From Swiss-Prot:
Disulfide bonds: none annotated. SUPFAM superfamilies: YhbC-like, C-terminal domain, YhbC-like, N-terminal domain. HAMAP family: RimP (MF_01077). It comes from Rhizobium etli (strain ATCC 51251 / DSM 11541 / JCM 21823 / NBRC 15573 / CFN 42). Belongs to the RimP family. It is found in: Cytoplasm. Required for maturation of 30S ribosomal subunits. This is Ribosome maturation factor RimP. One of its GO terms (cellular component) is cytosol. The keyword Cytoplasm applies. Keywords: Cytoplasm, Ribosome biogenesis. NCBIfam families: PRK00092.2-5. GO terms for biological process: ribosomal small subunit assembly; translation.
Length: 198
């Protein structure tokens, strides 16, 4: 999947209510800057806090990127004025134990542990935890690490039933996330070098 495909890929898990209105305001700005929205949440911390999670199309996000995103969306939010009280704007990367919101997240992080929740019962459950062993256009196969008596070890979860999903922090995940970040930075540096030579 290319970066162009990534920026056009819709999120499986989206917000509702005010959070949805905020996402509708913020997402076009992010896409125009080469970023993808992961999640928007209004929290009642330290007064009110708007938490925006984003990443570049290649999956990276630096402190400078967070600052750039904050400076770009702040004036748009001031003009749209969707919140009727003072709030703090907090922009961050999704982190290593990130929310999984797109189909490509399940492909990219195949082999890693995830905990997820579904909107409907699948095999008498709505909550699952296990390793992503396969992902396709319709859903993903989870190999559970905690199987109750009489349950199958593997379960297929359709994307249409998914209501929440998040990676579980493990040593393998940290290693692979650092490796992916290093590779993305090297590719960006090579691209910048090629652009400078033109």
């Amino acid at each position: 999947m290319t970066n162009a495909d990534n920026e056009l890929e819709p999120r499986l898990i989206t917000e509702t209510g005010l959070d949805q209105r905020l996402a509708d305001i913020i997402e076009p700005v992010l896409v125009g800057m080469g970023f993808r929205l992961i999640r928007v949440r209004m929290l009642n911390q330290n007064g009110a806090t708007m938490q925006v999670m984003a990443e570049r199309n290649d999956g990276t996000m630096t402190v400078q990127d967070c600052e750039e995103v904050s400076m770009a969306i702040s004036p748009v939010l001031d003009v749209e004025d969707p919140i009727d009280k003072e709030y703090h704007l907090e922009v961050s990367s999704p982190g290593i134990d990130r929310p999984m919101v797109r189909k490509s997240d399940f492909v990219r992080w195949q082999g890693h542990l995830v905990k997820c929740e579904t909107s409907i019962m699948i095999g008498n459950r709505k909550r699952f935890r296990g390793k992503i062993v396969e992902a396709d256009a319709d859903g993903f196969t989870l190999e559970r690490d905690q199987v109750a008596y009489g349950e199958e070890q593997k379960v297929i979860i359709p994307f249409t039933a998914l209501s929440d999903a998040k990676l579980i922090l493990t040593d393998d995940l940290i290693r692979d996330a650092l490796r992916a970040d290093k590779l993305a930075k090297a590719q960006a540096a090579n691209q910048n070098e090629a652009d400078d030579q033109e």
